[in-house]
A protein has these predicted regions:
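Active-site rim elements
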Residues: 34-37, 152-156, 173, 203, ...
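Catalytic beta-strand/loop cores that center a nucleophilic Ser/Cys/Thr
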Residues: 52, 58-60, 71, 144, ...
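Proline-centered loop/turn at the N-terminus of a beta-strand
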Residues: 113-115, 194, 223
């Protein structure tokens, strides 16, 4: 009898979870991934499957390691049409074509939500000079500028107190320690950007000061979520990281 009751409870729970996902709005997303220095072949699956388990999403994944081929894809007219949101998990730091980069950011300025992960913060701005009196297009969209990073070391993620219950951070425990990490240097956080968490890789590491590692921004009409966390597959695969991404999708889509 006890076995039957336990089995009934398990089946009821699974049915409730299934019904919850069925009733959730389903999205269509594109992921732009590839480039230098990361295991993008595996990460594209970790990210897409992890998000889909939390927020029903149908995916088109553009995986290209060559910078010029990736640029050609994103230069096509209407490449983002038909997608509810775009995920950038790529690393093309040495793009020099400012007009190309602006064409991407314009997609989001008119309202397309975006999720930017790890080396997306180093992409599209290192080799482009800012026009006098203006910010670089890519970093303006992200809401912050980053160049360089510390050594491979676990990162303690400390939530900003006043935003500890932000919808994106609500499932992240205070002081979460990533399995591995590579703490990015964030030289400037722009006005209008809301930092949700700072990362600390220890007193004997560099950078010496905690760095912004999770934030949100609004670029024109488009909501942007960005995190510098995620160099290693071990970090991206954690429940905490994937919960954060699922929450981020819900947040960037809420305005729409």
């Amino acid at each position: 009898m006890k076995l039957l009751i336990s089995l009934f409870f398990v089946l009821s729970t699974l049915t409730a979870l299934s019904d919850h996902q069925t009733n959730m709005e389903s999205y269509k997303a594109m992921m732009i991934t590839g480039g230098c220095c990361h295991d993008y072949k595996q990460q594209k699956n970790i990210i897409s499957e992890g998000i889909s388990e939390r927020v029903p999403t149908k995916w088109d994944i553009f995986f290209e390691m060559d910078q010029e081929k990736s640029k050609a894809k994103l230069s096509e007219s209407g490449w983002a049409d038909g997608y509810d949101y775009i995920v950038y998990n790529h690393c093309f730091a040495h793009e020099k074509d400012a007009s190309f980069v602006k064409s991407i950011t314009d997609v989001h300025k008119v309202g397309k939500p975006a999720i930017a992960l790890h080396c997306a913060m180093h992409s599209y701005h290192w080799s482009i000079a800012a026009e006098e009196g203006k910010k670089k297009a890519w970093t303006e969209m992200l809401g912050a500028s980053s160049k360089g990073h510390g050594p491979k070391a676990a990162i303690t993620v400390n939530k900003v107190r006043q935003h500890a219950n932000h919808p994106i951070m609500k499932d992240i425990p205070e002081g979460w320690l990533t399995p591995e990490g590579e703490l990015y240097n964030v030289q400037e956080v722009y006005e209008g950007t809301t930092v949700l968490a700072y990362g600390d890789n220890g007193e004997d590491k560099n950078p010496k000061e905690p760095q912004a590692c999770v934030w949100v921004n609004t670029h024109g009409k488009g909501r942007i979520f960005a995190t510098t966390l995620g160099h290693h597959n071990s970090t991206m695969s954690t429940m905490e990281y994937l919960d954060m991404l699922g929450n981020a999708v819900t947040w960037v889509m809420a305005k729409n």
